[in-house]
Amino acid sequence: MSDAFSTPADHALSHPELEAILENAQAGPSSIGDGAEGMSIEEAFEVDETVRRVLEGDYKTIGLQFPDELLPSSVSVYRAIQTRIAHTGAQAYVLADSTYGNCCPDVLSCLHLPADFLVHYGHACLTPTDALPVHYVFPRQKLDVKQAVESLLAASKNELDGDGRKGIVVVWDVSYDWLANDIRDTFSQDSTIQISFASIQKPTLASQKGLKDVKGKTPALRSVEPPQGLEMNDCVLWYIGEEGRSCMNLQMTHANNPLFIYSPSSQSVSPLHRTTSRLLSRRLFALHQALSADVFGLIVSNIGLASSKPLLAQLREDLKRAKKKSYTLSVGRLNPAKLANFAEIECFVLVGCAEGGVVDSKDFLRPIITPWELELALQGPDHVWAPENWTLDLGTVLKDAQEREIKIKQDSSTADSDDDSLEFSLITGTMRTKKRFAFGNGTHTLENNKLLGDGGVQDLTLRNQNFSLSKLESAGSTFLASREFQGLEPRYGMDEPSVLEQGRSGVARGYTEEK
């Protein structure tokens, strides 16, 4: 009955009349990019390479993740892939409306299938993931490579001649990676300047099988390195693409380097390093807000990012050692309304990808910082603000945090600091006493992180270095006491208990006693 009056769920993917329509389908400028105009669907979306990887890996459940702008081409791509892998018993699925963001692999949706292989279409942030094998298919945008070289050389002439910069590092957006060979050949024609290229390395079959490098890390998909024999401070950065999160991340992680961006749409060059100090000033302001916070919320931006799980565990342990209260949240895509529901949280820490890990919007009620900034804030007033070390790489932050933890354990004096001392807040301009939260039902010890007095008898009392009693607070009760509205008036013990009476019965349009 339902088939006669409704369209089947798989109508758009399996209807036989689509064969003739999709047989000669071509990719247009509105689909995968203007560089793919005139190409077939198979060529523009790398169907042959995708099928080859599926067959070599013997994958059976394949997720095809499309951003919103590429959904019109999803049916054509799905049918082209499915017809070539059906004989192996494999099944492909179209994934849309990503849980977190289009730039990251949607691992959560893949786990719902569950999928053992994911094809990611469109723009990508290139943050490594170790949850499942991923194959990236980038957009294809047009680029006049010769014009780009001439414009960038003319704009950065003063930095190369006057400032003593000896090298150039060329970085491009993923939508121009299909022209990588042309970019290398054209940019390397000037032999008087040393040039290195931040090439994109797509995951190989070895990395798809879950293999890691000799250090136990998931290999990076792109690394920005100076030319051989030079330091990074000796180089000028050239970026090919439009302004966005990817460019801003490059700008902040290399704050000491001149950065010039070439916009292919306008064929113009702009110096971005002049605005770097303003961006870093915002991050420094958020850092000082974190110094005054006692309750933190750890936001999981994407569950499939490499090093995200051990980093979350490390951040929770660091906050616990500092007597800070932490909550772990997974809210999908961020917006001010979602985070406003957690009013007791004073500062959020976003564990995210290379492009979505920084939130500078003023619409959020509380500050949102990065894991690197949190580790710096936990050092207290003794921290050293070093913009050249600012990073969104989760693996780097995890390594530094683990090394700092080892030093703290080796130096016993740091674990016996005076946590009840006053500190000055640069944000509010007032003196404050740091809150110390208790964990569990007993007294928390710094030596072995165990709880004492589980049976209700507390034979040991926590004291600070001056041998005075230390006050341990509860995050929930402290926040409730500070609120003006604490709920309806309870009136405990103020009213006599009333006798239970029979209430109304019936429906709203006519109760029993009204008839």
UniProtKB/Swiss-Prot annotation:
Taxonomic superkingdom: Eukaryota
Pfam families: Diphthamide_syn (PF01866)
UniProt key word Transmembrane: no
Gene Ontology CC terms, in alphabetical order: 2-(3-amino-3-carboxypropyl)histidine synthase complex; cytoplasm
Metabolic or biological pathway, per its Swiss-Prot or TrEMBL entry: Protein modification; peptidyl-diphthamide biosynthesis
Binding of [4Fe-4S] cluster, residues: 104, 125, 353
Note accompanying the cofactor annotation: Binds 1 [4Fe-4S] cluster per subunit. The cluster facilitates the reduction of the catalytic iron-sulfur cluster in the DPH1 subunit.
Region (Disordered): 493-515
Compartment annotation: Cytoplasm
GO biological process: protein histidyl modification to diphthamide
Cofactor(s) the record lists: [4Fe-4S] cluster
UniProt KW keywords: Cytoplasm, Iron, Iron-sulfur, Metal-binding
GO molecular function: 2-(3-amino-3-carboxypropyl)histidine synthase activity; 4 iron, 4 sulfur cluster binding; metal ion binding
Chief location of this protein within or outside the cell: cytoplasm
Family annotation (PANTHER family): 2-(3-AMINO-3-CARBOXYPROPYL)HISTIDINE SYNTHASE SUBUNIT 2, DIPHTHAMIDE BIOSYNTHESIS PROTEIN
Family: Belongs to the DPH1/DPH2 family. DPH2 subfamily.
Chain's role: Required for the first step of diphthamide biosynthesis, a post-translational modification of histidine which occurs in elongation factor 2. DPH1 and DPH2 transfer a 3-amino-3-carboxypropyl (ACP) group from S-adenosyl-L-methionine (SAM) to a histidine residue, the reaction is assisted by a reduction system comprising DPH3 and a NADH-dependent reductase, predominantly CBR1. Facilitates the reduction of the catalytic iron-sulfur cluster found in the DPH1 subunit.
Subunit record text: Component of the 2-(3-amino-3-carboxypropyl)histidine synthase complex composed of DPH1, DPH2, DPH3 and a NADH-dependent reductase, predominantly CBR1.
Full protein name: 2-(3-amino-3-carboxypropyl)histidine synthase subunit 2
The organism of origin for this protein: Cryptococcus neoformans var. neoformans serotype D (strain JEC21 / ATCC MYA-565) (Filobasidiella neoformans)
Gene: DPH2
